[in-house]
Amino acid sequence: MDLLRLSRLFSGPHPIGLSVLQRLDLLRSTQWTGGREGPAWLRAASCSSSSHQKRMSSLCSDSSTPVAPQEEEEEESFGTLSEKFSSRRIFHKSTAQLYNLKLKEQGVEEEELEPRLRQGGRNTPYWYFLQCKRLLKEGKLAEALDLFERQMLKEERLQPLECNYTVLIGGCGRVGYLKKAFRLFNDMKKRDLEPSDATYTALFNVCAESPWKDSALQSALKLRQQLQAQNFQLNLKTYHALLKVAAKCADLRVCLEVFKEIIQKGHAVTEETFCFLLMGCIQDKKTGFRQAMQVWRQMLSLGIKPSRHGYNLLLGAARDCGLGDPEVASRLLLTSQEETILLQPPTGRRLAGGKVQAKTRHGVSVKHVEALERQLFLEPSHKLEGPPAFPEARETSRTQPEVETKAEPGHMGALAPLALKPPDLELQVNLLSLGALSPAVVSFGTVATPADRLALMGGLEGFLGKMAEHRLQPDIKTLTLLAEVVEPGSPAESSLLSILDRHRVEADITFFNTLIRKKSKLGDLEGAKALLPILAKKGIVPNLRTFCNLAIGCHRPRDGMQLLADMKKSQVTPNTHIYSTLINAALKKLDYTYLISILKDMRRNSVPVNEVVIRQLEFAAQYPPTFDRYKEKNTYLEKIDGFRAYYKQWLKVMPAEEPPHPWQEFRDKPVRNQVITENAGGLRDG
């Protein structure tokens, strides 16, 4: 009877026993999680239910009763899990090591993106702007970029402002980091931030300071085209940055194109504008000095007061550039002012600081700038062209006779170098002024050296006198440039130290390095060494450039070896430039014994070799083109053979110098040992 009742419980369309067992299984699964066991009565009930289930399964297998619906559903669902894998064609192997590696990488990424806990509230974008500005003033561009990109964007996930990008682009501009600056600019546009005038000024400035001039010029011209397509109006400061790009990366013609655009837009022409034109003149090494004098005289004709920076640019032109064709220079610089001055001051009111209002500028127009351009690039066969639209100037030129190019034999003189002119003529020649020159000066003579070009500007005293007329005092850069252009070994060079004290200018190591280099080039090594006690008296410490300038005059082996020994005593390690200078001094004397001694010392100090040194040594290892080894014995050729044998072995053991990338120091991420805190308003060790 009991078996019949049990069979009825587990048979039929809706067996009651199976539902009870399912409820018990559900209760067991919910309460026995985590390896915990239930009470004893529940375990006994489960055991009894399992035994009953086994009995019924055996009874069902013996009898011909149909299969339960739940078992039918389980049979139907068997094998359906493989459907989502059956469509795959490629299977990746997965091991425990790969899984652990994946977890480690995820942990590193989460650690990088996890914001650091800071004291105080959350920082603002303007606070980050101030911190980046402070770091850039300290010359820490890499730290400023890391602070912006890692801490502000990744860790705190703040939305940057336009000023955050502009200050970093400006920092990149100071060092010429062109690639990073345009990356920041593109990221700025992706965030829908509107660039300001300061942003475009910083972008043009980074193009001007880039070490790769061609690519920088292309980037600047492309940016200029984009701004023109957007009809974006540039201010004068941005135009000056564009003018700086043209002066440093292009030539004077491109500068004049920008200059004409500045006038077309109605901007005021300032002294800074002409300074950038002077920088463009310096790019022409052949005729840059003559062009610089023309631009200078046009600036003075507008009544614009020059600055100390403008005088320094003139000295740079005298040092690096030539006068060009003497006939053209005589026609442009020695003729009457009415024929050569094309930019006239306006009749309206003049602003303070030398600026001219655009609305009242009657003398400066695009037509006159084009005439100035034709004069700047005048060829010997071309005819001198006067101002195109100055009726007042034309009437004056009709009433006054032109300056004669021919004079009486007793009054004719050529503007020759300073040492060849009479003493009274030296004081009358100064092209820096707009006044007429002496009638005795009708043409230029040989102007080949920087000292000759300085003589055209009145010499040392005349140049400083012109600065005094404009109430300008020379700085250390002015005196350093004067030291480079004065006649070597002249009294003017000796008077530079007294001028230094007279104007109370604090000397630096660059000024004394210039004097030491000039004396060493003359072969006056003792005179160069005599300047070292003056350095010590003024508290100036010599640097590697000082020893390199001394090495120029070490033509004898004992002088060169003594210099290396003195550097060792001073605990200064010679670099590649010093050894290259000594090698050059030995090559001028064809002293192979001296050359081998230099290479031995270079090997002892393990100084890496650069391309310049290799070219020097390859030239030293060459045989004379017309020598015959078997004709007769030649001691000179034997020395070359000895040097070639040592040079071959020397190359095998010497390290090579890899030139550093200009932007490498900014690409390296700084060590993350400092955290910005709001409490101190700066950096704090974290």
Curated annotation (Swiss-Prot):
Keyword set includes Ribonucleoprotein: no
GO biological process, one term: tRNA 3'-end processing
Protein's UniProt keywords contain Mitochondrion: yes
Taxonomic superkingdom: Eukaryota
Annotated stretches, region: Disordered: 55-79, 383-407
Polar residues composition bias: residue spans: 55-67
Key words of the record: Mitochondrion, Repeat, tRNA processing
Renumbered ranges of PPR repeats: 124-160, 161-195, 196-234, 235-269, 270-306, 508-542, 575-609
Chief site of localization: mitochondrion
GO MF annotations in UniProt: tRNA binding
Family of this protein: Belongs to the PTCD1 family.
Subunit structure: Associates with mitochondrial leucine tRNAs. Interacts with ELAC2.
Protein name (database record): Pentatricopeptide repeat-containing protein 1, mitochondrial
Lineage: Eukaryota, Metazoa, Chordata, Craniata, Vertebrata
Gene name, Swiss-Prot/TrEMBL: Ptcd1
